[in-house]
Amino acid sequence: MKHPFQILTSSTDGKLLIASASSPSKESSLLLLLPELGDVLCQQNVPQPIYINYLETGPDKVLITADVDKNITIYKLENNELHQLKQQQMPKRLSGISTLNNDAIVCDSLGDVYQITIDTQPAVKKEDLKPLLGHTSPLTAVVAAQYKNPPKSFLITSDRDEHIRVSNYPKSYVIKGFLYGHTQFVSQIHLFEICKESRLVSGGGEGKLFFWDWFREVLITEFDLMPYVEEYLHEFHIKKSSKTKEEQDVQKEQEVENIQPKYEIGVQKIDSIEGEDGVFIVTLVENTSCLVVVHFTDEAKHAQTIQLAAPAVTFAIVGNKLFVSLDAENDNILTIYKFVDGQFVNDDEAQSSIAERIILANPINVEDKSKFAPFYSINQLRKRGNNYS
């Protein structure tokens, strides 16, 4: 059976769907697909055993991957083939990738951010790499932001300790400011534009979305995801206690029967699509069989909850299509929706043709679902008392 895609994303120009699947045996594949047809434009089977866990696209048909062996690999698409430009060994395992100008910007689990030039120059020794900036907590994401008036570049970083930091670029040791509001880890940050203004939406361990005017360091509004995902929660989401086993046993004896369990949720992915009257934010809460769509103008309102046939692993918006990778058996691992009049609706024609082609093109096969790679790690960022989970 086919292994689900762990990574789906759009090319920078919005013309290609990029999909990656990696099995626990470290087989990996990259597919560059035409989203309107499902045809494979280019396929890259990674020659050495490697597990790709992050992927980012850049300008000029550049593709950047990070793997669990601490490598950054930079490819360029030329004549419908991926050519490796560079592979750089990093000091620590990576936790996010962005691009700015002709540089890859990467963050790691130690809390540092590095700049890797997108060129064919030889890689340097990892010991010689110098961080652009650092947090005192493991980083979870980095995005490069451009402010138009006055024109200036910034790096926005998030970490396990509730921080979102805005730093100048390239002098990233100069901190512009922080975005305060989170009380749990921040797992996702996403830039979007509305009315020609750059905005940021973030999500993490509170189960909320936070909307920011990041340049002015102002929290615009919050949106609570829990009411829209609660019916899709299960044992995975039940809040874990930081108490000792003895304390838990005493608590169980004192509890009244039929008390509803308390849940804790984490945001796994955020993306956006423009509508006629605002921006629609699509959010995946980890290990749920739904996607929550929020309509944002100057406030955030629930627009839609998309019910899925199985838990979503990831998703991508390419043009007006929404591609969702599912943690499912029987090769039903991809479903497609189209965006029409502010709603995502089933794209039956695409499902019967495009989705089937993409699934068949996936070269990673496993014996059964028990051989799937682990998909759900966001909740491991959560603190338990004075410790992390």
UniProtKB/Swiss-Prot annotation:
PANTHER family: TRNA (GUANINE-N(7)-)-METHYLTRANSFERASE NON-CATALYTIC SUBUNIT WDR4 (PTHR16288:SF0), WD40 REPEAT PROTEIN 4 (PTHR16288)
Record's keyword terms, sorted: Nucleus, Repeat, tRNA processing, WD repeat
Signal peptide extent: none
Compartmental location: Nucleus
Main location: nucleus
Gene that specifies this protein: TRM82
Gene3D superfamilies cross-referenced by the UniProt entry: YVTN repeat-like/Quinoprotein amine dehydrogenase
Protein name per Swiss-Prot or TrEMBL: tRNA (guanine-N(7)-)-methyltransferase non-catalytic subunit TRM82
Biological-process GO terms, alphabetical: tRNA (guanine-N7)-methylation
InterPro entries tied to this protein: Trm82, WD40/YVTN_repeat-like_dom_sf, WD40_repeat_dom_sf, WD40_rpt
Pathway: tRNA modification; N(7)-methylguanine-tRNA biosynthesis
Subunit and interaction comment: Forms a heterodimer with the catalytic subunit TRM8.
Function: Required for the formation of N(7)-methylguanine at position 46 (m7G46) in tRNA. In the complex, it is required to stabilize and induce conformational changes of the catalytic subunit.
GO cellular component term of the entry, any: cytosol
Xref: HAMAP family: TRM82 (MF_03056)
Cited SMART domains: WD40
WD repeats, residue ranges: 44-86, 134-179, 184-222
Superkingdom of the source species: Eukaryota
Family membership noted in the UniProt record: Belongs to the WD repeat TRM82 family.
